[in-house]
């Protein structure tokens, strides 16, 4: 067993020595295996890259056999690999929405026992904050009971008393949460801890673990790595780091503080366990960033952030680093798209070799895809789409609003416009029925259109929808001086009204009359079937598959599955409890709104669009970092947790080395220059830094101070990009 650190700055290709070590380990013995551990968000890309580089090193046909003994995993995938046939992995894991249900129930039942958090259940976001703190403490390897001696001492000062009272409430809530999870038969999502315990019983002497792409770890992940170092034949850890920190922690102001702290933690763990520590391998030969301008930018940023003497003036070639100022967001994206097309058509780049980074995807997303489509640029937005945009969520919200506001016409129309309420649809979900279903759907849509016109004209609300009597109305054509023929209008609008009247009043009455959560959940499920929701979603999925829209098809399937899982967890938590309709509505609206679709990574030729925080050195040949404004780069960070920065620091000061809460706001702000470093080093050949002069309603938007410093210190031109730009050499200065 041994551990070795692979170090280097962003210019160096740290993967090269890791791939070489992997090849060497696999060739030494036919029984040897390698697990390459990387963050989940880059696992797919990293797996392709590792296998490609390994094949390039292999010289004979037999060498290809070694790749079958190589796995590229995240920590959680590694847990699945080892624990899939154990009770740890077969147990049901509670979803975030299910956890929120349990916390909600505890807060209601324990309201009179709480002191600080009494009544907070109605505060927006409180339950989410509570669950996040619970997860943070579990990941930080902290048991509240371990804090008792410290908290007792805090009674000596007023602030300490508040902290103690807060943790008394948290102790009560978290203890009951764990107890109820056990009672309901749920396994908490602490799979990393179970993996650590399990691997201590496994012979890993033939296994090499390669850990890459991380700068820091949770306390539980550190414990797992400690087990790997003690049990495995070899452990290699790659860190983006300029120097070693075996005995002392780095200066908190250091650009590489997080990685330096991780180095120090792992070094000390290995030393305490008497695990052999090999000499660091510092990569200096293999270069990841090939453009001299970008190499110079890398050196400049390190020098400026480490407060070292400035570098001598660099001769910039002008073909690697570009600074743009656009007239507005639309023009910014238009010029980015134009340049991408030029790079592909004129310079031979592939779309998949280009990435777009932003920290404000909400601002750019609606414009980005249509503008790129206009320029015929295939694009993949690496972002989990929120489920709250799906019509099923709108259907549930409007259904509950109809009950709450007694058939207010705008709620009824929202409900109908989802096109999920289609009770007459009893078609089978086979391919042969798709045409028939489309005809039926179009006929129903036409009736809804007519109904909407009638409702807007006559203002039908309340009992007009719930009564059995059909609508009757007269329309008079004053020009022709005669009554209009409204028979068809009456017939088709009443068909819609009758469908609602036949199902909704009885459904609402059944829900109100339900005695238990199980009874109410059963009523709700049958209503989903009777109103045609399940069939509609199946047909939407089939329609999307026919059109080749596989992601859309998956989204419909995931939405229905998420609703069914939520319903199952509701029955588990509230099934035997007295039914409360208001709580039911809150749970099912917030439960789906907080979920996201899982996306399947793409390997086809597309431009990748992702968050700046998720990039890595050399991720693409070309990077466009857009929206580089002062409001988001550096990011304005606020503490939105249940613990203040002072409380966090106070608690962290009392914990052992293998325990810690996440950093304070100040610590997170101090990480911003490193995020910028990752962005600036994300391109191997070309980097474009851009920002809009006008954004939303804000005039005279200012560039990021990082953008300004680079322009001023390196004396670079800023290219103006607007609708009237003719020549690329139109420049300006920020000075």
Residues covered by each model-derived region:
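Accessory N-terminal region flanking or inserted into the helicase ATPase core
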Residues: 2-5, 109-210, 250-251, 292-315, ...
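Extended, charge-rich low-complexity interaction segments
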Residues: 96-116, 263-284, 406-431
């Amino acid at each position: 067993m041994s551990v070795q650190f692979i170090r280097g700055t962003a210019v160096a290709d740290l993967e090269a020595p890791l791939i070489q070590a992997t090849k060497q380990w696999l060739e030494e013995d036919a029984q040897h295996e390698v697990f390459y551990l990387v963050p989940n968000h880059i696992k797919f890309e990293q797996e392709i890259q590792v296998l490609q580089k390994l094949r390039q090193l292999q010289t004979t046909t037999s060498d290809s056999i070694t790749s079958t003994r190589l796995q590229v995993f995240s920590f959680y995938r590694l847990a699945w690999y080892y624990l899939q046939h154990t009770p740890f992995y077969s147990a049901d894991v509670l979803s975030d929405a299910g956890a929120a249900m349990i916390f909600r129930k505890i807060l209601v039942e324990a309201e009179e026992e709480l002191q600080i958090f009494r009544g907070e259940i109605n505060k927006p976001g409180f339950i989410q904050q509570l669950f996040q703190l619970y997860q943070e403490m579990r990941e930080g390897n902290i048991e509240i009971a371990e804090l008792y001696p410290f908290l007792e001492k805090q009674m000596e000062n007023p602030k300490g008393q508040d902290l103690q009272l807060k943790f008394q409430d948290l102790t009560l809530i978290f203890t009951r949460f764990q107890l109820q999870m056990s009672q309901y038969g749920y396994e908490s999502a602490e799979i990393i801890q179970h993996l650590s315990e399990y691997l201590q019983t496994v012979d890993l002497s033939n296994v090499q673990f390669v850990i890459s792409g991380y700068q820091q770890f949770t306390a539980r992940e550190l414990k797992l790595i400690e087990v790997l170092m003690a049990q495995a034949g070899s452990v290699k850890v790659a860190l983006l780091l300029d120097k070693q920190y075996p005995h002392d922690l780095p200066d908190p102001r250091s650009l590489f503080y997080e990685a330096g702290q991780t180095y120090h933690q792992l070094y000390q763990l290995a030393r305490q366990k008497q695990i052999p520590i090999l000499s660091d391998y510092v990569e200096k030969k293999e270069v990841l960033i090939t453009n001299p301008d970008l190499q110079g930018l890398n050196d400049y940023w390190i020098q400026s952030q480490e407060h070292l003497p400035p570098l001598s003036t660099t001769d910039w070639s002008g073909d690697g680093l570009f600074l743009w100022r656009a007239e507005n967001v639309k023009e910014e994206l238009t010029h980015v798209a134009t340049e991408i097309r030029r790079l592909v058509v004129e310079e031979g780049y592939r779309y998949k070799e280009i990435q777009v980074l932003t920290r404000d995807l909400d601002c750019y997303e609606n414009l980005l895809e249509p503008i790129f489509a206009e320029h015929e640029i295939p694009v993949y937005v690496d972002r989990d789409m929120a489920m709250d945009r799906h019509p099923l969520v709108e259907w549930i919200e409007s259904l509950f609003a109809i009950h709450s506001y007694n058939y207010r016409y705008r709620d009824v129309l929202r409900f109908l416009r989802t096109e999920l309420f289609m009770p007459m649809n009893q078609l089978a979900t086979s391919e042969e029925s798709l045409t028939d279903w489309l005809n039926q759907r179009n006929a129903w849509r036409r009736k809804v259109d007519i109904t909407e016109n009638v409702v807007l004209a006559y203002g039908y609300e309340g009992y007009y929808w719930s009564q059995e009597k059909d609508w009757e109305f007269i329309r008079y054509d004053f020009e022709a001086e005669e009554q209009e023929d409204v028979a068809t209008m009456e017939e088709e609008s009443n068909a819609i009204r009758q469908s609602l009247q036949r199902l909704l009043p009885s459904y609402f009455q059944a829900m109100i009359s339900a005695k238990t959560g199980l009874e109410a959940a059963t009523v709700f499920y049958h209503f989903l079937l009777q109103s045609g929701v399940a069939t509609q979603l199946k047909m939407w999925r089939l329609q999307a598959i026919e059109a080749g829209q596989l992601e859309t098809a998956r989204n419909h399937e995931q939405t229905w599955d998420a609703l069914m899982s939520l319903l199952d967890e509701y029955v588990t938590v509230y099934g035997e409890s007295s039914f409360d309709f208001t709580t039911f509505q809150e749970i099912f609206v917030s439960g789906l709104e907080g979920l996201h679709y899982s996306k399947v990574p793409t390997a086809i030729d597309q431009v990748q669009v992702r968050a700046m925080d998720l990039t890595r050195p050399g991720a693409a040949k070309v990077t466009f970092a857009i929206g580089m404004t002062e409001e988001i780069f550096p990011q304005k960070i606020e503490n939105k947790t249940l613990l203040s920065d002072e409380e966090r620091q106070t608690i962290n000061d009392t914990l052992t080395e293998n325990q810690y809460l996440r950093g304070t706001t100040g610590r997170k702000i101090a990480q911003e220059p490193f995020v910028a470093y990752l962005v600036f080093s994300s391109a191997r050949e070309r980097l474009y830094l851009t920002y809009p002069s006008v954004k939303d309603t804000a005039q005279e938007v200012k560039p990021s101070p990082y953008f300004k410093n680079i322009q001023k210190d390196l004396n670079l031109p800023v290219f103006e990009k607007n609708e009237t730009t003719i020549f690329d050499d139109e420049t300006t200065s920020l000075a």
